[in-house]
Amino acid sequence: MPNCCLKLYTKKESKMNKLNVVCGALVIDGKVMIAQRNYGSSKGFFEFPGGKVEKSETKEEALIREWKEESDIDIHNVQYLANSIDYQDGYEIHLTCFTCTSNEKPTKLSVHSEYIWTTPDHIYDYNFFKSDKMLVEALKGVWPCLTKPMKPKY
């Protein structure tokens, strides 16, 4: 059997524009922040904030810029979490999710109507897109590592 990979596209998918998008699960004091969208076809859905990656930047740079623009905070400790692909409004969206931290909590709202601080045990109390639910599951898998200090093994 050949050692190769082939992705088959449906007619609908092959004509779609592709977007690279990033989002960040901000973890502070044992809770993760989710945000409710306030416009467009995603109005009312919750997500991890982020946005489109510009051609001149890395995904991590895009995430830091988007958090500053949308929430007016500086994030750090940006760590890769998971990828997801979604199809919305004629776009094939390649979503990369990171975890991050900050020394401050956001107060500015621009593309969101509210911020909620929750834990993975209660995160499904809020409405997420199917593609974002895969990211939530990835977050649940690493949650103990994000919220408990590491103890050295002797």
Give, region by region, the residue ranges found by the protein language model.
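Active-site-adjacent beta-strand/loop module that shapes the phosphate/pyrophosphate-binding cleft
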Residues: 84-106, 116, 120, 132, ...
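C-terminal structural segments of small proteins and small subunits
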Residues: 126-129
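A short coil-to-beta-strand element that immediately follows conserved catalytic motifs
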Residues: 73-83
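Charged phosphate-binding loop/patch that engages nucleotide di/tri-phosphates or the phosphate backbone
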Residues: 131-154
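Short, Lys/Arg-enriched N-terminal segments with co-localized hydrophobic residues
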Residues: 3-15
